[in-house]
Amino acid sequence: MENAKMNSLIAQYPLVEDLVALKETTWFNPGTTSLAEGLPYVGLTEQDVQDAHARLSRFAPYLAKAFPETAAAGGIIESELVAIPAMQKRLEKEYHQPIAGQLLLKKDSHLPISGSIKARGGIYEVLAHAEKLALEAGLLTLEDDYSKLLSPEFKQFFSQYSIAVGSTGNLGLSIGIMSARIGFKVTVHMSADARAWKKAKLRSHGVTVVEYEQDYGVAVEEGRKAAQSDPNCFFIDDENSRTLFLGYSVAGQRLKAQFAQQGRIVNADNPLFVYLPCGVGGGPGGVAFGLKLAFGDHVHCFFAEPTHSPCMLLGVHTGLHDQISVQDIGIDNLTAADGLAVGRASGFVGRAMERLLDGFYTLSDQTMYDMLSWLAQEEGIRLEPSALAGMAGPQRVCASVSYQQMHGFSAEQLRNATHLVWATGGGMVPEEEMNQYLAKGR
């Protein structure tokens, strides 16, 4: 971006100067509305989420047999919700900032099949596509026991079709593993920041991995191009997919059920704050949408991004969405948080969700490494760097009087609050790689 343009952008949005300087930045969104006002802009409804929920239930018997690690849960891919009181104390001590309320962790990092939040959206979209093909071919009815999809005749049928996706790692992992298991031919287009072990794992499942020297945006574009030349190839579009988004959104009702099981209350007197790491935006956008449908105006969602990849904060704050990239303002999009290394946000998610998100913040790679090692020390839970992005949120919220006033929170409401950090990945990181991460924390 030329200097004059840049200067006028900064004059209009002074916060951009802090982003360019790679400062850890927090922006509380002044444009939030009630769910009732914001919902029409999403273009999806509660019924769409219910349909996704029903589809996953139809596939549960199949998943229970195809992936024995899901059998105990009846073929439902869901993660634990745990309190992390020792980490809460450690954060308070390190940052000299009390966290009012209780700190919880949602362990999507340990979801079965692919060990990340992408096991929600990625697997769901592959299943939805497989169902559509089988229904159209007259091989399946909605009333069938879907475990019949494991038969050789279905493997043969699906082998005529292929799936392609562009990914920094975790989405490719979930789509690759699921597609290969069903019988699709699958190609994952991986960006330069994708971890070697993720590529190796995909190849071990018979997935074709195409590697690029460039970033996520290029991998997605190339994947899209390659798929266009083949009528039997289905491209899963992380930047624009409504189906992926709905796969993530099912998490809202599931979390509501987990809260009920644990006797946790969410209402006006007991607000819920949720902190979601954000790459291109599909995962956190879908989850936040589901949470809003489940808890209404009593849940407050925040997106967390690396200082080197603040694409969603930049897009929503300036209102330019996918018309601007972090590279346009001179930021390199290089971060240890490989799952979040995205320079241009999803225009669909930004426009759909901007009224339903309370804020956005950035944190440095070093902050993620520090919190990664504290969590391992205090709670014995090991995550990948990206997954710690949400962990910086509770201090930002508890330290901001202006945010609390904007929403009229009393001291008592904050004392009764629940702070939920969404841990997005790390359950499958190899030991030696994890030890390197741990060594980088202070």
Curated annotation (Swiss-Prot):
Keyword annotations of the record: Lyase, Pyridoxal phosphate
CDD domains: D-Ser-dehyd
EC number of this enzyme: 4.3.1.18
Catalytic activity line of the entry: D-serine = pyruvate + NH4(+)
Subunit structure: Monomer.
Cofactor(s) the protein needs: pyridoxal 5'-phosphate
SUPFAM superfamilies hit by this protein: Tryptophan synthase beta subunit-like PLP-dependent enzymes
MF terms (GO), sorted A to Z: D-serine ammonia-lyase activity; hydro-lyase activity; pyridoxal phosphate binding
Source organism (scientific name): Escherichia coli O1:K1 / APEC
TM annotation in the entry: none
Pfam families xrefs: PALP
Broad class of enzyme this protein falls into: lyase
The protein's name: D-serine dehydratase
